[in-house]
Amino acid sequence: MPRWIFAFILPCLLLSLGVLIQAQAAERELVILTTFSREPLLPLVEEFSRRYQGIEVQIIHRRAQSSVQLLNKSYIQNIDLVLSSSPYLMQNLAQSGKLAALPEPMQTPEWLKPYALPMTEHVATIGYSGAGLVWNQDYLKTHQLPEPKQFSDLAKPVYFGHVTMSTPARSGTTQMMVESILAKYGWQKGWEILLRVGANLATASARSFGVSDYIANGQFAVGPTIDSYALILGRKLDYVQFVYDESFTLMPTYVAQIRQNHNDQYAKAFIELLMSNAVQTNMEGNDFAKHSVQDQSLVNERFTRLPMGSIIRREECLNDLFDLAITKHLPQLKDTLLAVLEAKEQFARRPSVLAKIEQIERTVFTMPISEQEVDALAIQIAPNSALSEEQQAESAMLLAEKGHEWQMRLEKQLEQANQELKILLAEEAQ
């Protein structure tokens, strides 16, 4: 063979060999996208690796909306599975045709369906969590605080500066808790509770599992969390206590397989492992700490049930509203509550003045944006894979414009309440 022909063919052969090796490597790899932290998944990954030696398992952690954005990128082809408690994420992927259909035995059991996604033929429910309050018993004793029984207790002034929680924008489970409070108490009463708890926050945790960590470390007293994070710490630290709150909904844990052009045998094998009797019977005992779909012991009708369709649709709007009302105004909200509490103590024996202060307090903790406004906006900007990039940009612009309007209304209301309190105190000082 002439040398020049060999010199031409050799790079092509090497390139083809490289592509073949890369493809074979991808076939020996399992990539899991999850909204959970990495550590609780390690026992499951280790068991899978023991059964399928030589298969590399990668875990990618993203929040729900970031996961949707990641999977919408056309060049992302290597993700095999999605593991999450976010109904928003799973419904979005199912509706956009990104998920492979699953066999009937892998679908949600009937008794859990009232708390689960309405669309389940592409999603397997592998377990579920309850939610409640976690607290540090030593901290409560030191600060002479009562043991809380339910989330609404955290709205009481006695917990001012002792509470932490995550935000719905950063945590899908927190979003479910917020929606649970709104469903149980109604929009206005629910927001009053949320705003009062918000004013009691020492800080908003950037991560949902950070709530239990903060409390275990003794930085704060109490906060809402799913049971798995609290129960794991409670096994190691006897001063960490947890109580279920039936104000919250039950939260299924979902797994789904991303639809690929090839038959991904290891993705199917991992789902089968999660559904196996060996894993299901030990799920609560390991660091994953979920209730098995074989275990109905926690389930009762008192847990709040959510209208899944509407809460999935309005997730982004509600997350923005929570951040505008609480997260971004946390210092002002706390200062206002402190001023109100001090004024109430000062005029505790002046009923006429106290009544005016309490009216100002009601204004502070009233949500000026109606549920109808939020739902109407959610319908307008509802995610749709058929939308062009221009239409998606228009939806984002509409959300930003509405968010600015909401922010102005919230700020005006808080400023008005502060001004009224200052005027009242000045008048009474004369």
Task: List the predicted regions and their residue ranges.
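C-terminal non-catalytic accessory extensions
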Residues: 345-430
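A ligand-binding cleft/hinge motif common to bilobed small-molecule-binding domains
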Residues: 88-92, 216, 221-239
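Early extracytoplasmic/lumenal segment of secretory-pathway proteins
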Residues: 26-91, 364
